[in-house]
């Protein structure tokens, strides 16, 4: 995160094994044109054994959805496309009216527009989740009778939120490769800063007790602070989650659970040392962290900011510190994992060099689940705002190969984010189900919590109105 004046900037075949499994379902009619979709057929409620049905067989925009006996009609034949849509009649999409994100919103069909309110994630656990709202498709009131309304509701694992008949997001072996070209859907602004703050930014996120736990930086326009959101279940809940200030700033934080020592670690910048860490047994308590300790004490040349935007990750032997300098370089330090938490000292290796714009800040490093691969993303400055470039490596101590590394083909940016409220895709964190030091992400279900701002916002960097949003990978 930069403190100065610069702006911060399928076609795919149906899987044979899944087709065979779906054919075994008596009520499921497999589509005859699978090349156009990830999966097709009736969508049957697990709790009711009845199908998702367009009321009265209507093909009009605004027709509502209900449960009804499965009978094989065209108004019960759904296609899950590679662009994240659920279509019926070929050209109508499952749609959330008016981009609503409130539990209890009744869903409808509408002419396909590509909007985020028509994007759905069909998960392997049977849930169907609205990308824009983060809410689950469900039979209202756990009803099972013909005519039961179908609506959005907070995901709770109930049988009325489980559906069978379409391929889930992960393939049958549970692993995916990283795409060479990324395409995302974006939420709108997920939260506004509470009174006294002009920005919410620099997010780090983990899953804790089944809920999202998000720390970030705040700006008042003249100074920086730190905060944590009260844990929440769905991204649509972020707007109403409590915003809790920390009594000691931890700017541009990294949060994770260090399993070898059974302790939570919060690393950050700007204090008595370039990088600092604190520990806790309860990461939800913003003021329950230990006294600050040095994480890194070195300095770098050719940088107006000094070391900035650290991130931490471990393999089986070592703990690694990666950081930037707003100067076209990425740096790395390491220590034996048995010595952590501790001080990396002042030594480091420069592992990447390019222009300042191409390697600016916001570096993050992750282990790719199911692959012998690590993913690095670095924030860059482009003609159309901030964006992220990606690199891959087979080891944390090795060299990094550009992957999606241009403004026209970025990891995430204006060119592929799907966001309409921001051009900038800036400092954030990939969502991890496993909060530990391996920083493992699931390439089948990538989500990216980022900061964006209105394209019309300008002026001093410290006063820019950064807000949170989430990208969801479209496969």
From Swiss-Prot:
GO CC terms, sorted: extracellular region
GO molecular function, one term: carbohydrate binding
Cross-referenced InterPro entries: GH62_arabinosidase, Glyco_hydro_beta-prop_sf, Ricin_B-like_lectins, Ricin_B_lectin
Domain Ricin B-type lectin: 39-166
Enzyme nomenclature, EC number: 3.2.1.55
Catalytic activity: Hydrolysis of terminal non-reducing alpha-L-arabinofuranoside residues in alpha-L-arabinosides
Location of the protein in the cell: Secreted
GO terms (BP aspect): L-arabinose metabolic process; xylan catabolic process
Pathway of action: Glycan degradation; xylan degradation
Signal peptide: 1-37
Keywords in alphabetical order: Carbohydrate metabolism, Glycosidase, Hydrolase, Lectin, Polysaccharide degradation, Secreted, Signal, Xylan degradation
Family to which the UniProt record says this protein belongs: Belongs to the glycosyl hydr olase 62 family.
Its biological purpose: Involved in the degradation of xylan and is a key enzyme in the complete degradation of the plant cell wall. It has a specific arabinofuranose-debranching activity on xylan from gramineae. Acts synergistically with the xylanases and binds specifically to xylan. From small arabinoxylo-oligosides (ranging from arabinoxylotriose to arabinoxylohexaose), it liberates arabinose and, after prolonged incubation, the purified enzyme exhibits some xylanolytic activity as well.
Protein name in UniProt: Extracellular exo-alpha-L-arabinofuranosidase
């Amino acid at each position: 995160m930069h403190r100065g004046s610069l702006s911060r900037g399928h076609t795919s075949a149906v899987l044979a094994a899944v087709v065979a499994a779906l054919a075994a379902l008596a009520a499921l009619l497999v589509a005859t044109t699978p090349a156009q979709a990830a999966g097709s057929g009736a969508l049957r409620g697990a709790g009711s054994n009845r199908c998702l049905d367009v009321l009265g067989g209507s093909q009009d925009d605004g027709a509502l959805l209900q449960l009804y006996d499965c009978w094989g009609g065209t108004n019960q034949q759904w296609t899950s496309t590679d662009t994240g849509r659920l279509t019926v009649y070929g050209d109508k999409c499952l749609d959330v009216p008016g981009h609503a994100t409130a539990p209890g919103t009744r869903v409808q069909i509408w002419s396909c527009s590509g909007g985020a309110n028509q994007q759905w994630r069909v998960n392997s656990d049977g849930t169907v989740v609205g990308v824009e709202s983060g809410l689950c498709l469900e039979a209202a009131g756990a009803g099972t009778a013909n005519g039961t309304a179908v609506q959005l509701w907070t995901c709770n694992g109930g049988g009325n939120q489980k559906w069978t008949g379409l391929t889930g997001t992960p393939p049958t072996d549970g692993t995916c490769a990283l795409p060479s070209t990324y395409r995302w859907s974006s939420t709108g602004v997920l939260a506004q800063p509470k009174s006294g703050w002009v920005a919410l930014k620099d997010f780090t996120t983990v899953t804790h007790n089944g809920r999202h736990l998000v720390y970030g930086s705040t700006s008042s326009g003249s100074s920086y602070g730190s905060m944590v959101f009260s844990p929440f279940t769905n991204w649509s809940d972020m707007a109403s989650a409590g915003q809790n200030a920390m009594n000691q700033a931890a700017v541009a934080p990294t949060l994770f659970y260090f399993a070898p020592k059974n302790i939570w670690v919060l690393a950050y910048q700007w204090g008595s040392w370039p990088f600092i860490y604190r520990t806790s047994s309860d990461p939800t308590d913003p003021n329950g962290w230990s006294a600050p300790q040095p994480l890194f004490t070195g300095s770098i040349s050719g940088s107006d900011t000094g070391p900035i935007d650290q991130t931490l990750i471990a393999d089986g032997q070592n703990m690694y510190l990666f950081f930037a300098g707003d100067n076209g370089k990425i740096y790395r330090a390491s220590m034996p994992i048995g010595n952590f938490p501790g001080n990396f000292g002042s030594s480091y290796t420069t592992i990447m060099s390019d222009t300042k714009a191409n390697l600016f800040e916001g570096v993050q490093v992750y282990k790719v689940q199911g692959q012998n691969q690590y993913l690095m993303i670095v924030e860059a400055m482009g003609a159309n705002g901030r964006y992220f470039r990606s690199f891959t490596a087979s080891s944390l101590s090795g060299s990094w190969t550009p992957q999606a590394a241009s403004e026209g083909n970025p990891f995430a940016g204006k060119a592929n984010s799907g966001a309409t409220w921001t051009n900038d895709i800036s400092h954030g964190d990939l969502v991890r189900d496993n909060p530990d030091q391996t920083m493992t992400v699931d390439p089948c279900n990538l989500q990216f919590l980022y900061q964006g701002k209105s394209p019309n916002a300008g002026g001093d960097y410290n006063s820019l109105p950064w807000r949170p949003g989430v990208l969801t990978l479209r496969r």
